[in-house]
A protein has these predicted regions:
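Alpha-helical transmembrane segments in multi-pass membrane proteins
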Residues: 1-12, 16-78, 101-104, 127-129, ...
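Membrane-interface capping segments at transmembrane-helix boundaries
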Residues: 11-18, 79-87, 280-287
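Central hydrophobic cores of alpha-helical transmembrane segments
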Residues: 23-34, 178-185, 234-244
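Hydrophobic alpha-helical segments embedded in the membrane of multi-pass proteins
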Residues: 208-224
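Membrane-interface helix-boundary motifs at transmembrane edges
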Residues: 12-23, 86-94, 166-174, 226-230
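Membrane-interface helix/loop boundary segments of multi-pass membrane proteins
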Residues: 108, 155-183, 197, 227-231
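C-terminal membrane module of polytopic membrane proteins
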Residues: 201-208, 232, 238-287
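Juxtamembrane "helix-exit" motif on the non-cytosolic side of transmembrane helices
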Residues: 38-52, 116-124, 192-199, 249-256
């Protein structure tokens, strides 16, 4: 996770700072190392076959348990570090009045984007059925609870991207230029899963182009919310919602919807226009 790199740098360069959340940082770096080992093992270890002859890795559930257990310890150490240390290193959760409004705005924009996409594909009636299904809302609120048990994954990105790298790039390339460049960095960071998870390698380049559209446009919105609230938990929660609401509102109620997608070059222009109109407009607002 990018956050682990930030923490390692702070542990080395600011080890004399009494406000450094040392225990919290050390734990997160160690957790990241464990997840790296598990990831490598899942790639190198031979895959098993389930009863349906589908390939699966025995390391996948192990990684889930590590993330869940790690998230529990994460919250304990974060709270134990104290307000002063959290405030000194951007871990504080303040300005919740405006923060909640930003999160609700994102949910509204996300659903608007979903409705437009369904309308363009002629599936608006199916989306209406999904929204009217009580199971959808049960799963939705279950997903919200799961945030607390999977937080390390989203914190791991956003503490590195939004808390550390965004201000650094904005200082060098301007408020807007820094955010756009960060979106490009964020997109490239997703390159392996673009080729081997979201799609198959033959569609990898189209998936990467689509990732640039998503990361730049969504990154603009997330950057705005962070500058507006100075609350790192806002982009963390938005990142979580963005990754998980598709599972709910696609009607599949399964993360499998993210895997082996069909992404074609002809889809990119429409996605670019729609994402910039829905998320990118905030670049013209003052934070």
């Amino acid at each position: 996770y990018p956050a682990a790199g930030v923490m390692m740098a702070y542990l080395i360069t600011k080890k004399g700072d009494k406000n450094l959340p040392t225990a919290f940082y050390i734990f997160f770096v160690a957790l990241t190392a464990v997840l790296v080992v598990c990831t490598a093992a899942s790639v190198l270890a031979p895959q098993n076959r389930d009863l349906m002859s589908m390939p699966y890795s025995q390391w996948a559930p192990i990684m889930e348990y590590v993330i869940i257990g790690g998230s529990v310890i994460f919250w304990i150490l974060l709270l134990k570090s104290g307000k002063e240390k959290r405030r000194s290193y951007g871990l504080n959760s303040e300005h919740w009045n405006i923060s909640i409004r930003m999160i609700l705005l994102f949910i509204g924009l996300y659903l608007l984007r979903f409705v437009i996409a369904c309308a363009l594909s002629g599936q608006l009636s199916e989306f209406g059925k999904i929204m009217a299904n009580p199971t959808t809302w049960i799963i939705f609120f279950t997903v919200l609870v799961n945030f607390f048990l999977s937080v390390v994954a989203f914190f791991g990105e956003e503490y590195g991207w939004r808390y550390y790298l965004q201000p650094l790039l904005q200082k060098k390339f301007g408020l807007k230029g820094g955010v756009i460049l960060l979106g490009c960095v964020w997109a490239v960071w997703h390159l392996p899963i673009d080729f081997f998870y979201y799609t198959t390698p033959d569609m990898g380049l189209a998936a990467l182009a689509s990732q640039f559209v998503t990361c730049i446009s969504l990154g603009i919105f997330m950057a705005y919310t962070y500058m507006k609230t100075q609350n790192i938990w806002v982009p963390i929660i938005i990142h979580f919602l963005n990754n998980n609401m598709v599972v709910v509102f696609s009607g599949t109620y399964s993360a499998d919807v993210l895997q082996n997608q069909q992404i074609h070059w002809g889809d990119i222009p429409v996605a670019l226009v729609m994402n910039l109109l829905i998320y990118g407009w905030v670049i013209f607002l003052k934070p």
